[in-house]
């Protein structure tokens, strides 16, 4: 089984990483004093790679991805995309959340159209309509284009959110437990759809999940976080299965259960969750939550607006 210690200082890079998280720490002030969420996190991501991040609640997974998205800044260290420091949200990175963040009074078509209008304001009406249709078709929602969020299922809402994110034409797609609220069948369907979209669009994907089986099916590498406070990357598992992946073939492979058991041992034996820990989730931040909802709901327009204020 191929694993690596992401904090090993002897690791060297042959060339500049596409996405580089370098010695990142995050500290929040609290009434009881400073609280260190992350400490010394290092991760290099190749262009086109699919990375899943897993760990117990409160280990800083969302905090880490918020720094990649630009919604939050590290207390120490740097996050760089193509060797450029990330200091704010931007159209090269787009997030999809578990709770969809769609505008409920607008149709699926109009929710995606907002993103297309933001990125391609100079294109003709016909060209914009073709782009919206393209992204809705990509996620299998052509027939539901005129339906509003309240008229479609949770899985379809998440498809709209993914289509809207893709319409921004990001280089990095950031997914924060996007399928966590879905039933098992819908979740598996969307996992297959996500892999298809990832392949066809040459995306780099960072995805938070609590589902080891989901991570083993989707990821090139599984990043496993230690517990907080002062969480860091404990180990990274290389997922060896050939692509395109077949779920039945993978689950019949003995290596699948070796990897699964290794990840389970990491999470529930070596880093068992302390139920008495006062911090069950990343520190709440109402201002950050508002920014995330706005960006999710309005796409690039909200990102551009927030970057200016």
For the regions a language model picked out, list residue spans one by one.
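The feature captures the beta-strand-to-loop junction immediately N-terminal to the Walker
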Residues: 54-56
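Helix-to-loop junction immediately C-terminal to a conserved catalytic motif
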Residues: 69
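Conserved ABC transporter NBD signature motif
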Residues: 77-89
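Short coil-to-helix segment of the ABC ATPase nucleotide-binding domain corresponding to the Q-loop/switch region
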Residues: 106-115
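Conserved ABC ATPase "signature" region
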Residues: 124-144, 196
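Conserved signature/switch motifs of ABC ATPase nucleotide-binding domains
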Residues: 147-150, 168
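Hydrophobic anchor residue at the start of the ABC signature
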Residues: 162
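Catalytic Walker B motif of ABC-type/P-loop ATPase nucleotide-binding domains
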Residues: 173-176
């Amino acid at each position: 089984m191929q694993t690596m210690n992401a904090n090993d200082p002897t690791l060297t890079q042959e060339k500049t990483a596409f996405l580089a998280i370098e010695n990142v720490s995050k500290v929040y002030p609290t009434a009881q004093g400073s609280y260190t969420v992350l400490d010394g996190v290092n991760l290099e991501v190749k262009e086109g790679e699919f990375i899943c991040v897993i760990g117990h609640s409160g280990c800083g997974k969302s905090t880490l991805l918020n720094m990649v998205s630009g919604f939050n800044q590290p207390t120490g260290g740097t996050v760089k995309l193509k060797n450029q420091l990330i200091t704010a949200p931007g159209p090269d990175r787009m997030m999809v959340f578990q709770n969809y963040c769609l505008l409920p009074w607008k149709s699926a078509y109009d929710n995606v159209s907002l993103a297309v209008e933001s990125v391609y304001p100079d294109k003709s009406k016909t060209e914009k309509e073709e782009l919206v249709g393209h992204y809705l078709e990509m996620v299998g929602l052509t027939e539901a284009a005129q339906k509003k969020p309240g008229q479609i299922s949770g899985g379809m809402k998440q498809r709209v959110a993914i289509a809207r994110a893709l319409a921004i034409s990001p280089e990095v797609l950031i997914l924060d437990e996007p399928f966590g609220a879905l039933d098992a069948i819908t979740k598996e369907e969307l996992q297959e759809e996500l892999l298809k979209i990832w392949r066809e669009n040459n995306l780099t994907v960072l995805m938070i999940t609590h589902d080891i089986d989901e991570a083993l099916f989707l990821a090139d590498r599984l990043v496993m976080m230690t517990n907080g406070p002062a969480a860091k990357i404990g180990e990274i598992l290389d997922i060896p299965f050939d692509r395109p992946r077949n779920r039945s073939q993978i689950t019949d492979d003995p290596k699948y259960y070796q990897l699964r058991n290794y990840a389970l041992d990491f999470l529930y034996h070596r880093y068992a969750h302390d139920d008495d820990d006062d911090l069950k989730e990343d520190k709440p931040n109402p201002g950050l939550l508002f920014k995330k909802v706005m960006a999710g709901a309005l796409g690039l327009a909200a990102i551009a607006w927030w970057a200016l204020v």
